[in-house]
C-alpha cells in the first residue's frame, strides 16, 4: 500500500462519507490481502478477488461507530486477517468504495502475509 494505515478517526470520516452517500456498509475479511491465482490457469481468473463477508450488509446503518465496532469484532475473531470496508449502492447494485480498515500484525507490504 502507498498510504499509511488509517487511524480510527480517519476510518470514522470515511464511513461517515459512505453513509452520507447512501451506500450500505459491508465488512469483508481475508487471510490473504492480495489477488492471487490458485485454482485456475485461465487468463483473468483470480481467486483472491473475493473475500469472506462478515455477517450481513449493514442496511439502515446511520452511525459510523457501529461499523467501527464491527471492525473490532472481526479483528478479535480473526486477528490474522485483513479487514476491508465496502460501500455498496443497493439501487445500482454496485460496489462504490472499498478500503482496508485493518492489516494483521507482521504483514509485509510486498503483498504477502
From Swiss-Prot:
Example of a GO cellular component annotation carried by this entry: chloroplast
Species classification: Eukaryota, Viridiplantae, Streptophyta, Embryophyta, Tracheophyta
Record bears the keyword Repeat: no
Gene3D superfamilies per the UniProt record, alphabetical: Ribulose bisphosphate carboxylase, small subunit
A single BP term in Gene Ontology: photorespiration
Record-given protein name: Ribulose bisphosphate carboxylase small subunit, chloroplastic 3
Record keywords: Calvin cycle, Carbon dioxide fixation, Chloroplast, Photorespiration, Photosynthesis, Plastid
CDD domains according to UniProt: RuBisCO_small
InterPro entries recorded: RuBisCO_ssu, RuBisCO_ssu_dom, RuBisCO_ssu_sf
Misc note: The basic functional RuBisCO is composed of a large chain homodimer in a 'head-to-tail' conformation. In form I RuBisCO this homodimer is arranged in a barrel-like tetramer with the small subunits forming a tetrameric 'cap' on each end of the 'barrel'.
Major localisation: plastid
Top-rank taxon: Eukaryota
Amino acid at each position: 500500500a502507498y498510504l499509511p494505515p488509517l487511524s480510527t478517526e480517519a476510518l470514522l470520516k470515511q464511513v461517515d462519507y459512505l453513509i452520507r452517500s447512501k451506500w450500505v456498509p459491508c465488512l469483508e475479511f481475508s487471510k490473504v490481502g492480495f489477488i492471487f491465482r490458485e485454482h485456475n490457469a485461465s487468463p483473468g481468473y483470480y481467486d483472491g478477488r473475493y473475500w469472506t463477508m462478515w455477517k450481513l450488509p449493514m442496511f439502515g446503518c446511520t452511525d459510523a461507530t457501529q461499523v467501527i465496532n464491527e471492525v473490532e469484532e472481526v479483528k478479535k475473531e480473526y486477528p490474522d486477517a485483513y479487514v476491508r470496508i465496502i460501500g455498496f449502492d443497493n439501487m445500482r447494485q454496485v460496489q462504490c468504495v472499498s478500503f482496508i480498515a485493518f492489516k494483521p500484525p507482521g504483514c509485509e507490504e510486498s503483498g504477502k502475509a
